[in-house]
Amino acid sequence: MGKDEPGRQDLPKSATKASATPCSAIVCTVLDPLAKVLGIFNRFASRGIAAVSFHHQLKKSSLCLFLLTLILLAGTFRSALDAEATEPKRPNILFLFADDWGRYASIYADANGAGGINDVVRTPNFDRIARSGVLFRNAHVNAPSCTPCRSSLLSGQYFWRTGRGAILRGAIWDETIPAYPLLLKDSGYHIGKTYKVWSPGSPADAPYGGQKFSYQKSGGRFNQFSQNVTKLIGQGVSPDDAKEQLYGEIRGNFATFLEARPVDQPFCYWFGPTNVHRSWTKGSGKNLWGIDPDQLKGKMPAYLPDVPEVREDLADYFGEIAAWDAGIGVLLKHLEESGELDNTLIVISGDHGAPGFPHGKCNLYGFGTGVSLAISGPGVNGGRIVDDFVNLTDLAPTFLEAASVPVPEVMTGRSLWPVLKSEASGLVDPKRTWVVTGRERHVEIARADYSPYPQRAIHTANHLLIVNFRPERWPLGDPYRLDGDDVPTAEEITNSTRVTHPDEDAGPTKAWLVGVRNSPEWKSHYDWVYGKRPKYELYDRRKDPHETKNVADDPAYADVRAALEEQLLTELKRTGDPRMIDDGVYFETPPLAGPLSDEATFWEKPAKNKKK
């Protein structure tokens, strides 16, 4: 955050307390006349009228001292009251953060134009916050993998600066790294969380105080939404009543958190359901939400095969997004009923793109790193759509600034308050025209030698440049068992991520594409998704918005590639990325690579995988 950026003192008057208090008025009424008496007494004394006996002079001096003390106390008390009266009230912070939710919301169809897959998504509650606040069209995560993304968000730093928080499997949190939730707690905030904050990793949810501030005794069935609702329906419960049972758990957890809050203490609450993360019940998008897969026909981007199997899989994913949005609605309603809505900063986003789809999770394409982001609340000049490039590392300094908590110097994120307070739409801050993303290790056994797949990228409005530092490796993991006699079945690939290409989540889309890998029609598509990639990938987003045509070797783009690479590498070096030091040895050796260490908890250690 720049030193010249505005702080909480610039919040609008609507977020402040009343300018005068009854107590202050009483103090002034009682003590102001005493001050006048002292003034009159001193005038008489100066004329010799009070020049009597020494005894009388002593009494006069004592009275003067007493009155002077009262006046000084009154002035101090009044100054304190006036300062308190004009100090802005610190806002509550409600952060709603979904697992595996990219930039898919119905309002993005309105903002970007119809014709794409967002035409089919239904997110009325997210849309409500986006319309009342600011909708960001170019928000990206720093890493398209759960733990490193969350490490960067919670610390306000690039993921490569978070030690073992930079990887997924085998991650361990470094408690010396400042995390915004604990900084807010130390400043007087009542903090709490429900469901996932930081995991997999050890200790789980460490940057939020572990389970000390957990509120989820009302239940966690929402995290397997389609499975649990389908199960209840099978037991004779109506679809609406089945959903309401799960919504009730969300409501109960939030209510318990609010009830535990001391009077007049601002709160910071994190809602992190995992239902959008695979797996989902097949057909649930249509059965539970009325999302017809055929609605997606002709709308699929080039990297998603426009076939029935993939369309149904995507419709089921959108069904979980609809459930997530319904959960948002439950929290907003309860917040409004509690009387806290107007003084609550509401931020809604997700930790990366779609899981188990080409170009999605674990990829640096826009479909993998681009996420939804809407911000509304006190101090936010709403009703705008913003094109500034935002990294979710920017949220930590934004939260701290809202709470008047000093932002640690180590944070590389920049506060969004200059953008949030602006009245402009489109590009607000001319310096926010790019973001940097990257990844290292996701699943530890993705490659037989336990190595990562190191990538860094720079995203701009016109171009995407990706640098693959180890192009000899398989980007989504080794093609285990695909060339031998023990070829995995479609069911295995659908249900087990580690069977083959372990850096892509298991699911029907992955199973279908692997299944047609040798067909004349789809072999090139399979190779393009799972095959080895060149060191440089450059996409002209103006001509190729889906980022499918690599022009890195096109002489016409030589200057663009050189300029973007220099800009990217400069930022990596400026922020101390270990990948830039000694050929990245830090990320290539244990504990950042190699088998999981003994420090990993038992639930982090995978079952043995048969590799060929």
Functional labels for PLM-detected ranges:
Residues D4, D10, D32, N42, ...:
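Intrinsic-disorder-associated, low-complexity terminal segments enriched in Asp/Asn/His/Tyr and depleted
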Residues F41, A45-G48, F54-F66:
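Bacterial N-terminal signal peptides that target proteins for export
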Residues L11-C23:
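Short alpha-helix boundary/capping segments
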Residues L67, G75-E537, P545-E566, T570, ...:
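Formylglycine-dependent sulfatase
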